[in-house]
Amino acid sequence: MHSMILRNKPHGFIQCLILYLLVNIIQESPWARGDASGDSHQAVRVFIFAGQSNMEGADSNKDHIQRFPPFRGLDQPQLDVPFWYCLGRENKNRSQGWTTLQPVGSLVGPELSFAAHLKPELSGSLAIIKCAAGGTHLGGDWNPDQPSGFKMYPLLLQEVREALGQLTAQGVTYRLEGLVWHQGENDMFVPEYMARYGDHLIGFMDRLRQDLKAPQLPVFIGELCTKTIWGMDLRPRMYAISQGQKKAAAVDKHAFYVRNAHVGVEMGQPVGLHYHYGTLGQLEQGVEFAEAYLRHLGKGRKGNPSLSKWPYKEGETVRLFILAGHRNMEGEWAFVQDLESDDGARDWRRPISEVAFKYTLGGGVWQSNGWEALSPAGLYGTFGPEVSFGHVMQEALSGPMGMLKVTHSGSQIIDWTPEGSEAKDRHFYPVWIACIQEAVADLEACGHPVDLAGVFYHLGENDMSFGPYRRQAVSRLKRLMEQTRADLKAPELDWFVSQQPPTDQEALNRLNVTAELTELAAADPHLTHIKVFDLPQQDRLLIGTEGIVALGKRLAETYLQSR
């Protein structure tokens, strides 16, 4: 097989020598290996990445990658992954031919973690072609029939054809393996485009397959993250786009809807909300796209094993603790790799097989394998306060205890209310109550009476930064507690509600959530208000590893003091 060469031809002896060395390196590189199926043609898997700003990598920074342990090193070139790109609107940033996969300038895109996540799972090589520009519409710029504005559809075809043409010219056998698509935010602002997003996406996919002569090209459609400010102030519009995406995935057997509502989101100034994913969100959505592709191949991520030995004796009553919430309860900024042993010599990473642990994270994106030993179990190497909470409680209490964790970091409090909102697919209360009922039923089926020891809920972070939601935060929490108690037939179910410092901004400060919650707790003998205003490692809305450990310990200590 011939190697791939760069578009710009070198001149002079030194340049020719460099090219000669590169050619020989590439001939020994993954370009020359077979694919996972043992294809005799040694086809390279080529993926196309396309979309707008949250595909481009807006508001990301390659220097921030080191903050997030699972992704450290992705600021460096991935020498075994060829990369072709054209980014931007008026002023295009082009690779000028095939280059090595790495951040483009300071931008971090999902392709970095996508490739890194796939390489250990696949034999053979892969390559990425990327064409993206912020502020573009599927109804206009990406419209294959009547492209307008920045005419992204013909640009995409031009870039893909030229990139593939260079591979063909050099004798590289390739296989178009999928389109990774993240777009839709801008179509929200044009009523016609918003209403017809699903039809436009179906037409776009059909036409692209036709133009590329790839009739079965898989398309991985990235969900718009509801953790952004637009997930609140533009909730109905975001919902409309999501319905269009789901419609396209439902009618097209080669299209797949990729859930992204739980991935990280950049924190903006001054109140911590943003509409771009930033560095962490880009890297996490890259993993989700890779996992979607692996599921397409019949593979996919595997979780922790179920308990090998049931920790309770038949007939024993199990005290069940329920942890719930949004971004910090899920553990968005808390990483296992940053965990250090406690001053009391506790090893937070050590599984506790005496505590059965069940969880549903990211609104159901990640779930336990039945009951597991209590241990860090979040996506992307994250964990929540359940780890330190469980260690402290297990040491302090006698008798069997179990834990259930139910979180959705892409939700707001309204999603947890029994009424929900106009965004019907985001209604989380039915999931919440079903998780508790199923956990109780599981334990009872194993012969254990269940004592619901309490719900430990961390008040929604995003709600504190958006006036209309902050205004109704406590009343919505009250509805959640009331309906949960009613549905579980547990009118005296204890709630422990932790509250971090609410967003400090002049207009928002007129809404005194702390006072409202204090008043609610005074009127409810089964509600404990826990003010955690001194946690370490808090930056605006999010709490880091040390702070999440401290939060779990504080929750446990509050419960123990209340007994």
Where are these predicted regions, by residue range?
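Cell-envelope and extracellular/periplasmic
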Residues: 31-563
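Composition-driven detection of intrinsically disordered, low-complexity segments
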Residues: 12-14, 32-33
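Bacterial N-terminal signal peptides
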Residues: 15-27
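N-terminal secretory signal peptides that target proteins for export/translocation
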Residues: 1-11
